[in-house]
Amino acid sequence: MESGAYGAAKAGGSFDLRRFLTQPQVVARAVCLVFALIVFSCIYGEGYSNAHESKQMYCVFNRNEDACRYGSAIGVLAFLASAFFLVVDAYFPQISNATDRKYLVIGDLLFSALWTFLWFVGFCFLTNQWAVTNPKDVLVGADSVRAAITFSFFSIFSWGVLASLAYQRYKAGVDDFIQNYVDPTPDPNTAYASYPGASVDNYQQPPFTQNAETTEGYQPPPVY
């Protein structure tokens, strides 16, 4: 087991705040958290409007409720996930089990790759709905809508960077394991025993041997 596996410091050391804040994945994750906060705040705050003659609220993205729900959902989940993985990054050097580290890095890689794709879909979806929106339906909040679209676009790259960094950490951990792996080959000088605890003699008497008695010569029977 390597205590420094998967791109983390040696387990058991003291927490270094400066080193933690300068780690690439921590910086990228903080950027993702801010972008997600901006997206869902803009949609929640000014993504809904109503006509003068009605109090019924509707989504300003072409009155498509799915557009507002989708943008808000991926924004909230991205914010929560970013906060969670920031805590994991802070606690990661204290994890001495290489298997636990591997699973956390794989989870980070899969989630970051998935959210990169979801942000791309969200950007295309919101841009399309905003392009066909009737300007008369947007009484207020046009700037917030544009901000949500803009930071959805930026989030594609920030989460892509996170996925790339997670892959580099995973690959470094696998390469480190391969380099330090020792094949437990048996010692050829060690005798093999069929049963545990059985003693092995260096010399075994060959089968079917008899101890021959030597005769000094022929002795005739006594004569009476």
Curated annotation (Swiss-Prot):
Gene that this polypeptide is encoded by: SYNGR2
Membrane-spanning parts: 26-46, 73-93, 105-125, 147-167
Family membership: Belongs to the synaptogyrin family.
Organism of derivation: Homo sapiens
Induction profile: (Microbial infection) Up-regulated upon SFTS phlebovirus infection (at protein level).
Processing after translation: May be tyrosine phosphorylated by Src.
PANTHER family according to UniProt: SYNAPTOGYRIN, SYNAPTOGYRIN-2
Protein's UniProt name: Synaptogyrin-2
One Pfam short name: MARVEL
In-chain residues carrying the UniProt-annotated modification Phosphoserine: S3
Residues carrying N-acetylmethionine: M1
Subunit field text: (Microbial infection) Interacts with SFTS phlebovirus protein NSs; may be involved in virus replication.
Tissue: Ubiquitous; low expression in brain.
Domain MARVEL: from-to ranges: 20-171
Described purpose of this protein according to its UniProt entry: May play a role in regulated exocytosis. In neuronal cells, modulates the localization of synaptophysin/SYP into synaptic-like microvesicles and may therefore play a role in the formation and/or the maturation of this vesicles. May also play a role in GLUT4 storage and transport to the plasma membrane.
Keywords assigned: Acetylation, Cytoplasmic vesicle, Host-virus interaction, Lipid droplet, Membrane, Phosphoprotein, Synapse, Transmembrane, Transmembrane helix
